[in-house]
Amino acid sequence: MAFEELHDNWLTVYKLNERGEEVWHYNAEIIENGANFVCVRALFVGRRDEVRSGFMVFRRGDVMTEWFFNDRWYNIFRVQDGANGALKGFYCNITRPAQLSEEVVTAEDLALDVLVAPNGEITLLDEEEFEAMPLSAEDRTQAWAAVEQLKQRVVARTPPFDELGH
């Protein structure tokens, strides 16, 4: 496969804060493009070898399958152990709807995170950080609605949560 062909299957993901300022960016391989979403795969290459968030420990080399939506106030990261492929869980960021193009995804993070363990247990993170943000009432309403939508999807085992245990 020529480099140009491989390059066509990649894009750059930009994580922005609530003010639209870049916090982090990385390259990801496009897995699927839908009408209102893109699914990509990336390796965790954090600034540290290991990052703990709630019950989940991210390690350099972990595999992230990520869904970004331009019509939903969240994204979903499926986290697999880079060494053995085991499902670590799902990390869902509450965000404004993503901006999607052929080469770039941008998502404005609103601090709230929904972690889903492999057994389906749900943990909400960073409520205090979210409450301290200077957000509009509409943004707050949409963010809390997104948390509820994710919880409902997990309980119903709607894809990609259909592989969770009980």
Where are these regions (language model features)?
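Cysteine/selenocysteine-centered motifs that mediate thiol-based redox chemistry or coordinate metal-sulfur cofactors
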Residues: 149-166
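Charge-rich, low-complexity N-terminal segments
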Residues: 1-62
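Hydrophobic residues embedded in beta-strands of well-ordered beta-sheets
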Residues: 37-38, 74, 122
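A hydrophobic, small-residue-rich beta->alpha segment in the mid-to-C-terminal subdomain
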Residues: 108-150
